[in-house]
């Protein structure tokens, strides 16, 4: 995709985005934030700092376990079966025409089938449908597969944070 080009509309009828209900969210939110802590620690952050950052974001974005205004959590559904999740939201301090992929994951049993690409194409279409002109995300350095996918979809690096243990 060339710079400035709009992504093509998402047309794959097999993968659907379905809002998660309260029961699903009650299980998904704590599990997702626990996974987030592990990812932060894998990127070199201490357990204490990772938990503190996770708790602060959870309180801000899911007060009482419910998505705050502007936050949307959906199941990736393939042929009637939930195969992953997508969390879209307004970026913290972002503009009205921007949306942020806070979380996207295809369940392990369904990986390697192109569903990650389909999920991101669906996220792009969702963003356009919701008035967005830009989509952004964070990817941890150790997630080489996801970084390759995002590169192939035309995402560009905005900043890089690096560390070295001594």
Which residues make up each language-model segment?
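Conserved phosphate-binding and hydrolysis motifs of nucleotide-dependent enzymes
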Residues: 80, 84, 114-116, 154
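Conserved acyl-CoA
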Residues: 94, 107-109, 118-134, 156
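Acetyl-CoA-dependent GNAT
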Residues: 16-107, 126, 160-166
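Short, Lys/Arg-enriched N-terminal segments with co-localized hydrophobic residues
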Residues: 1-13
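Residues that form or flank phosphate/diphosphate-binding pockets in enzymes
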Residues: 96, 114, 145
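Conserved hydrophobic beta-strand within the GNAT/NAT acetyltransferase core sheet
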Residues: 101-104, 135-139
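Conserved active-site alpha-helix within GNAT-family acetyltransferase domains
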Residues: 117, 121, 129, 141-159, ...
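Active-site acidic-Proline motif in GNAT/NAT acetyltransferases
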Residues: 107-109, 113, 141-142
């Amino acid at each position: 995709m060339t710079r400035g080009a709009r992504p093509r509309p998402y047309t794959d009828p097999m993968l659907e985005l379905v809002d998660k209900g309260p029961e699903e969210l009650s299980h998904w939110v704590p599990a997702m934030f626990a996974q987030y802590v592990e990812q932060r620690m894998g990127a070199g952050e201490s357990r204490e700092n990772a938990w503190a950052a996770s708790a602060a974001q959870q309180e801000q974005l899911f007060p009482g376990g419910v998505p705050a205004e502007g936050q949307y959590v959906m199941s990736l559904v393939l042929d009637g079966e939930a195969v992953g999740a997508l969390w879209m939201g307004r970026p913290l301090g972002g503009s009205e025409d921007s949306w942020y992929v806070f979380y996207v994951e295809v369940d392990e049993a369904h990986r390697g089938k192109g569903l990650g690409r389909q999920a991101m194409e669906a996220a792009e279409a969702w963003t356009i449908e919701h008035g967005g002109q830009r989509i952004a995300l964070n990817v941890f350095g150790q997630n080489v597969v996801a970084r390759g996918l995002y590169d192939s979809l035309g995402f560009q690096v905005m900043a890089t944070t690096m560390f070295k243990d001594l």
